[in-house]
């Protein structure tokens, strides 16, 4: 009877400890011409593994508006629906505004102390550049790529922490960010896991994708068993 009571008390203690454990924070960066709310809505199936765990997801908006034909940048910046992390379209060699976005995200990271980062398309490239400096516990890049901007690419290539566990989700039919471009980003990380799907430029939500995302995050967090002071990012 005494043994059963001790087991019950131990289980109650573990449950209380788990309930009191701090929530893990994840920074989620949207793609070009999206915003945080759009990413949240379009990634509902993909992020189901996070809903079942103690994760707190953050969806900031990009600093800049995306210009349409005949629209100037000031008008675009006033549009809160179509945002970007830097000005310019795919293929341009100079990213105008990335320095401002980088500073803003570093400030947000220092304040919130994120544990992981998720990015889609332009947001994945931005998240990868942040990984090079901020060293999160894990990174998930959907349709990511190495930046075309030479200075940004050089900073990523020279500063990347190859040991950060990363998951690279690649659509084999993606014509906007080709699988080859996404693999070039994946090859920068020694701790990479590559997950392909038959779709195009999208965030997949199939059950097997969710299962692999959950397995990746669990394994990545298990790798980080040092004291929190050493594990948590410090700028």
How does the language model describe each region?
Residues 23-116:
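Serine-hydrolase catalytic machinery in alpha/beta-hydrolase-like enzymes
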Residues 38, 175-181, 204:
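Conserved alpha/beta-hydrolase "acid-adjacent" motif
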Residues 41-44, 153-154, 178-187:
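Short alpha-helix in the alpha/beta-hydrolase fold that links the catalytic acid
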Residues 62-63, 139-148, 199:
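Active-site nucleophile loop of the alpha/beta-hydrolase fold
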Residues 118-123, 127:
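Gly/Ala-rich beta-loop-alpha elbow adjacent to hydrolase catalytic centers
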Residues 148, 172-177, 201-202:
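Acidic catalytic loop of the alpha/beta-hydrolase fold
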Residues 168-170:
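Short beta-strand/loop motif that positions the catalytic acidic residue
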Residues 205-219:
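Post-His helix in hydrolase/transferase enzymes
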């Amino acid at each position: 009877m005494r043994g059963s009571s001790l087991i019950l008390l131990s289980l109650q203690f573990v449950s209380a400890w788990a309930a009191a454990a701090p929530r893990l924070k994840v920074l989620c960066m949207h793609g070009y011409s999206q915003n945080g709310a759009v990413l949240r809505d379009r990634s509902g199936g993909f992020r189901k593994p996070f809903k079942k765990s103690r994760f707190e997801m953050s969806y900031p908006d990009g600093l800049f508006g995306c210009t349409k034909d005949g629209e100037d940048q000031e008008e675009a910046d006033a549009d809160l629906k179509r945002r970007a992390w830097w000005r310019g379209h795919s293929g341009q060699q100079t990213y105008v505004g990335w320095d401002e976005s980088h500073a803003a995200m570093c400030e947000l990271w220092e304040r919130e102390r994120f544990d992981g980062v998720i990015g889609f398309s332009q947001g994945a490239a931005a998240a990868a550049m942040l990984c090079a400096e901020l060293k999160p516990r894990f990174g998930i890049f959907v349709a990511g790529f190495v930046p075309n901007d030479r200075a940004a690419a050089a900073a990523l290539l020279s500063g990347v922490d190859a040991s950060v566990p990363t998951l690279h989700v690649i659509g084999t039919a993606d014509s906007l960010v080709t699988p080859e471009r996404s693999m070039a980003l994946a090859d920068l990380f020694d701790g990479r896991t590559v997950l392909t799907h038959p779709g195009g430029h999208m965030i997949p939500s199939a059950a097997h994708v969710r299962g692999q995302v959950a397995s990746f995050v669990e394994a990545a967090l298990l790798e980080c068993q040092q004291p929190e002071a050493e594990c948590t990012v410090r700028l």
